[in-house]
Amino acid sequence: VYTPSEINSGIGTVLDYFRKEFKGCTLSDLEYVGDERNRDFISYAERVGADEVLVFRSNFDVDERGGDGSLNPNTSYMGWLWILARTNGGEWEHVDHGY
C-alpha cells in the first residue's frame, strides 16, 4: 500500500518520537508490520480524523533507571507497536504506541 519513501518517512516520525520521549532506552529493531496487518489499525486513524494509518513493530532496551520511570528498568520490550496516522497524504503523526 505504501511506497518505500512513505514508510521511511514513518520511520523518521517514530525515531524522532522515540529519541524525545524514551530517554534511557535503546531501540534495537523497527519494522513495518506489513499491509495486511496495517489495515487492522485503521480505527486509530479514524479516531483522530485521519484517513491513513502506518504501523511499526519494535524492540527496545531500557536502562537501569527505567527510562523516564514509567518502564521496567533493565528490561527489553519486544513487539512494541507504533501507530502513525495522516490525512490526504500529509505528514505522519504519532497517535499511539504500546502493546
Locate predicted features.
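Flexible low-complexity loop/turn motifs enriched in small/helix-breaking residues
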Residues: 1-76
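Short beta-strand edge/turn micro-motifs at domain boundaries
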Residues: 77-99
